[in-house]
Amino acid sequence: MLPTFKRYMSSSAHQIPKHFKSLIYSTHEVEDCTKVLSVKNYTPKQDLSQSIVLKTLAFPINPSDINQLQGVYPSRPEKTYDYSTDEPAAIAGNEGVFEVVSLPSGSSKGDLKLGDRVIPLQANQGTWSNYRVFSSSSDLIKVNDLDLFSAATVSVNGCTGFQLVSDYIDWNSNGNEWIIQNAGTSSVSKIVTQVAKAKGIKTLSVIRDRDNFDEVAKVLEDKYGATKVISESQNNDKTFAKEVLSKILGENARVRLALNSVGGKSSASIARKLENNALMLTYGGMSKQPVTLPTSLHIFKGLTSKGYWVTEKNKKNPQSKIDTISDFIKMYNYGHIISPRDEIETLTWNTNTTTDEQLLELVKKGITGKGKKKMVVLEW
């Protein structure tokens, strides 16, 4: 397990600047969303002596962040004139981890202490910034026990994976009960397999066919706790389903939950493997193909298919996110969930030496880059 954060012990450990620096946008562009981003230096309008001031430690660049810049994401922040702009603007980013560097004297600070590591309770707070300001501790969740990479990604991938496993099925951990999921190499799927294993639930993860299939499958099973990994060609093969699948699942197996983030043919194939009156949750659509399910699954097998959106779920019930983070941290501390560090490429923002132009190019690289998930880590 990676070492957790160390806490500053005095308020003199950090000097709050008069000017903040944020990556902002006023317009949207679908074809090249990097064009709408700019770096803005501004004086915060809040009274910092009466506010909770946070310095940013790291923020990931998520697909939802990019979709907001494109203007196609259903949830987006309100644009304001708070950043000394000619047009209303918003700070980009929905997720990140921060350190408390200044607290007000009143009750609004709650149980926060200088040096606490926190994440925002809700999305649309604007995380691509060197500092952020909050008015109440009730808008923040402490994550002191998590390493940097887990803390910076727990709001989206962590919550999604944990809630998909925990919030919809009343599991019998002593039974032979299964989850089937596609996109088995995704960050969310890796959380799912780890959480499920800790709860005594078995997982069948489907991944794309590839030359190094056995190598990837072994990592997913040995490192991330998947019970069994199969390929999409096996997932779509009716003979495999009839002759091989039952041997994998074992006696009295119950495939009770399907998790779909691909759509298209893959979603129908995982749905076919569910028991009667089971549930399929769709939380993504990587193939950009619609979810098409056979009529027979609904009529004769009583399939329920519904969507899951972590932003809306936690907006409607903020306590569910607080509880999820608490349970996630417990599993992390027990060693049931490992850090996603190996899956992340870090981009360094040195707050003393990185110029505005370099910062903008850094984030643009994170948006357009391929391969591993990109995370901007601030050096102070």
From Swiss-Prot:
Its EC number is 1.3.1.104. It is an enzyme of class 1 (oxidoreductase). It catalyses: a 2,3-saturated acyl-[ACP] + NADP(+) = a (2E)-enoyl-[ACP] + NADPH + H(+); (2E,4E)-hexadienoyl-CoA + NADPH + H(+) = (4E)-hexenoyl-CoA + NADP(+); (2E)-hexenoyl-CoA + NADPH + H(+) = hexanoyl-CoA + NADP(+). The keyword Transit peptide applies. Residues 1-9 form a transit peptide. Induction: Positively regulated by the zinc-responsive transcriptional regulator ZAP1. Keywords: DNA-binding, Fatty acid biosynthesis, Fatty acid metabolism, Lipid biosynthesis, Lipid metabolism, Mitochondrion, NADP, Oxidoreductase, Phosphoprotein, Transit peptide. The modification Phosphoserine is found at S339. The active site is at Y73 (proton donor). The keyword Magnesium does not apply. GO terms for biological process: aerobic respiration; fatty acid biosynthetic process; fatty acid metabolic process. Changing Y73N: 0.1% of catalytic activity. No specific ARS1 binding. GO terms for molecular function: DNA binding; enoyl-[acyl-carrier-protein] reductase (NADPH) activity. Its main location: mitochondrion. Homodimer or in a complex with other proteins. Interacts with ARS1. Belongs to the zinc-containing alcohol dehydrogenase family. Quinone oxidoreductase subfamily. Catalyzes the NADPH-dependent reduction of trans-2-enoyl thioesters in mitochondrial fatty acid synthesis (fatty acid synthesis type II). Fatty acid chain elongation in mitochondria uses acyl carrier protein (ACP) as an acyl group carrier, but the enzyme accepts both ACP and CoA thioesters as substrates in vitro. Required for respiration and the maintenance of the mitochondrial compartment. Present with 1560 molecules/cell in log phase SD medium. This is Enoyl-[acyl-carrier-protein] reductase, mitochondrial. It comes from Saccharomyces cerevisiae (strain ATCC 204508 / S288c) (Baker's yeast).
